[in-house]
Amino acid sequence: MDRGMKSKLYIDKNLQQFDDFKSTLTGDFCNFCADNLPIDNDFEVYVVADREPHGISTTAAYHVGNNKCVIYGKNRALVDILRSIAHEMTHMMQDEMGLIRGHIQDAGGFHEDQANARAGELIKRFAKSMKERKAIYENKNNFRS
């Protein structure tokens, strides 16, 4: 579903596990999340190799009011990176809907519970939507033709 929004995915060149196939899958997943949450405005997703310069203390962060997610990608399986993207994009949806006021607690509570639940749902729905998308669960690209 194209609502005229622009999405940008940036993958750190130091993340050597991202070949063209995984980069394409990641871009497809970001658009899948945007369509299914939904996200109504332009957004950016950064997958980075270093936490500190990007303000990440755990595995990911959402920048409230900027529609920007930053995901730590070093030494993580693709499915875990995608789950983090879906989690932070759920916060993006909450932000667009005006549901975020102030700080979001790190564990528990409405915002985190919804983000965790939606992330799991989006991963499963994406993997089931096309055969080659099941490759998100693999270390190698076993589903390419």
Model-predicted segments: where are they?
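Histidine-centered divalent metal-coordination motifs
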Residues: H87, H91
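Post-HEXXH active-site segment of zinc metalloproteases
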Residues: V79-R83, D95-E121, K131
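Active-site oxyanion-binding pockets that recognize sulfate/phosphate
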Residues: L15-D19, N75, Q105
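Short, Lys/Arg-enriched N-terminal segments with co-localized hydrophobic residues
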Residues: M1-G4, N142
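Active-site scaffold of zinc-dependent metalloenzymes
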Residues: V48-V79, M92-E96
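Auxiliary, metal-adjacent structural segments of Zn-dependent hydrolase domains
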Residues: D2, L9-G65, R125-A127
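Long, well-structured alpha-helical subdomains associated
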Residues: K124-S145
